[in-house]
Amino acid sequence: MDLHNIRADYTKQQLSKKECDANPMKQFERWLNEAIMAKVNEPTAMNMATVIDGKPTSRIVLLKEVDQQGFIFFTNYQSCKGWAIALNPYVALTFFWPELERSVRVEGIATKLSEQASDDYFASRPYASRIGAWASDQSQVLSSKRTLVAKVALLSAKYPLFVPRPAHWGGYLVQPTKIEFWQGRPSWLHDRICYWLVENEWLKERLSP
């Protein structure tokens, strides 16, 4: 399959180092808000990469909260990503908003949220999602879809109203050490503004495209 001629020229916006906030988390919130306002498809979706024994793997997860501490998501602790983080907490996140010709790359360290924080978020989820957290042995081989459906039925009967949070399910905070903002530009001369955390202070620089 010849894909050589599939390309796009990015012309929508540019990114000035001077106009970027000194705090990359504030800059990220600004861009995320703009993605939401532009009705970007799945603006909170992020590719998360982990590494075990030098072997990287990645998957799409949803950002559920962002603040000055970092990026928060929730998952099954016994999933592949949960085991990976337990062995190596260094992760990378990538957001891609093609409608705005923008991307954000994050490198950081993932740590578990408190049980209270995980309880609070779990309680806010739709009933079916809470049942699903119990029913799914995430990333494990499933004999058939029928087995999963039957398990959901049993759990729904067991928890008709209140569904407690499973101990194997909860949240992570990714505390960033590096954040790069990418804005597509014509002729592949893209704008790249990168922040590094150095002795608890953010250093901001422009990178070559």
From Swiss-Prot:
Cofactor info, note text: Binds 1 FMN per subunit.
InterPro entries, sorted: Pyridox_Oxase (IPR000659), Pyridox_Oxase_CS (IPR019740), Pyridox_Oxase_N (IPR011576), Pyridoxamine_oxidase_dimer_C (IPR019576), Split_barrel_FMN-bd (IPR012349)
Binding site for substrate: 7-10, 64, 121, 125, 129
Catalytic activity: pyridoxamine 5'-phosphate + O2 + H2O = pyridoxal 5'-phosphate + H2O2 + NH4(+); pyridoxine 5'-phosphate + O2 = pyridoxal 5'-phosphate + H2O2
Pathway: Cofactor metabolism; pyridoxal 5'-phosphate salvage; pyridoxal 5'-phosphate from pyridoxamine 5'-phosphate: step 1/1; Cofactor metabolism; pyridoxal 5'-phosphate salvage; pyridoxal 5'-phosphate from pyridoxine 5'-phosphate: step 1/1
Cofactor dependency: FMN
Name of the protein: Pyridoxine/pyridoxamine 5'-phosphate oxidase
Organism: Haemophilus ducreyi (strain 35000HP / ATCC 700724)
Biological classification of the source: Bacteria, Pseudomonadati, Pseudomonadota, Gammaproteobacteria, Pasteurellales
